[in-house]
Amino acid sequence: NLYTGDVQGCNKNLPGGIRTGAAIATRDYYASGCYEVVAKVAPVLGACSAIWTFEYEEYDKDSEEYKNYPDQTGKLAIVNHEIDIELPTANADFDTPTFHAARFNTYEMENRSKSHFQTLPEAVDDGQWHTYRFDWHTGDANEQPRVDFYVDGQLLYTSYEHIPTPASRLWLGIWFPASKDSDGDGFGDTGWTGAADFDTAVF
């Protein structure tokens, strides 16, 4: 909320302040396998440091593919295949966001997803390099589809729900989840990462 620089990548100046995130992505698409990133997260509450795979599809209501999604009722079936590691976050054990927790998510589409809140062995806002990894298994006749999530070599969680199948691009980025209007101005300014009360932060 304290950022006063140029607006980049968005087209609005909101009363709560200017928020400009950033992301990089691979040009190529990659399928199931082991994904590992060594990174220092942005060490401030209010911004989400994220590592994710993403593949996006839209199917018009008149298309054959639309019929594969009978729970969709709009003009388009929007399908986003995604695997996420996001920090910081809050979970049932914490009233406020903390770097002692992360979100591990798997998506087949917005209403077919699993979000898991995981306590970490140690806080990761210590300015040190940490290794974030997920092993993506799409499964076969002998193996159940799953995603195994690791931090610093320790397996912390396995998701068996809504496991993506198509090849995806790998993304690294920082963004600002806003879900609660804490100051009553009509705009969400405090999300599950906290309030963004800083000028700049680096992931």
Regions found by a protein language model. Name each.
Residues 1-203:
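GH16 jelly-roll
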